[in-house]
Amino acid sequence: MKIIPALLVKTPEELESQIEKLSSYFQHFQIDIADGKFVPEKTITLEEIANIASLRTQPLLSFDFDLLVSDITAALNGIDKISQQIKVDMIFIHNLDSFNPKPNAGIAIDPPISVDTIKQEFDLNSIPVIQIMSVIPGAQGRAFIPETLYKIEQLRNAGYRNKIYLDGAINNQTIPLIMEKQFRPDILCIGSYLTQAKNIEERAKILGKI
């Protein structure tokens, strides 16, 4: 199971600091982009990320973007520009009204959204990747919602064969709940359990055993 640190930051300095602390252990990151409209919280912007010179000097790093924004078109255009400077892997879209499947653009299923709704709206296997949110998105530190884990089983039973991410409140208390399930995610996106850790090396070793 792959581990990707999830970075929810407000400033370029905070982003650089977190990447610097974690890049000895991880080379793939997910950055949350929130516009203060789709969710109340507001994060670093794509324009600010594009101006971080230090990211352009680290070619081994790759980045996912988790888009909690109303204007998906503008965000995708911004990521297109960023992709000329850094390696962009997957993009996750929460605003399903604006989603059109692309090779590197998948969806994020927020807790209120059912798998049945996704099946009605989309051809499942046209979606290259799906991220299941195990918290209400927008801020780190929110409570884990165990019922969201059943969506993994529902997707697999519906014939979905592409990768499934899980994001939200993943830590030493919730990982056992995830691992006891027959159907598990392919990738765990882990936020404050890593970014706020006093001993990142110890936590990275624990996660490496999953």
Outline where the language-model segments fall.
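Positively charged, amphipathic and often flexible ligand-engagement surfaces
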Residues: 129, 142-143, 147-156, 188
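Catalytic cores of alpha/beta
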Residues: 15-22, 71-83, 112-125, 169-188, ...
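Conserved, mostly hydrophobic/aromatic
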Residues: 22, 32, 79, 130, ...
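Alpha-helix-loop-beta-strand connector modules within alpha/beta enzyme cores
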Residues: 42-65, 104, 108-111, 148-170, ...
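A short alpha/beta connector and helix-capping loop motif
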Residues: 37-56, 60-76, 175-195
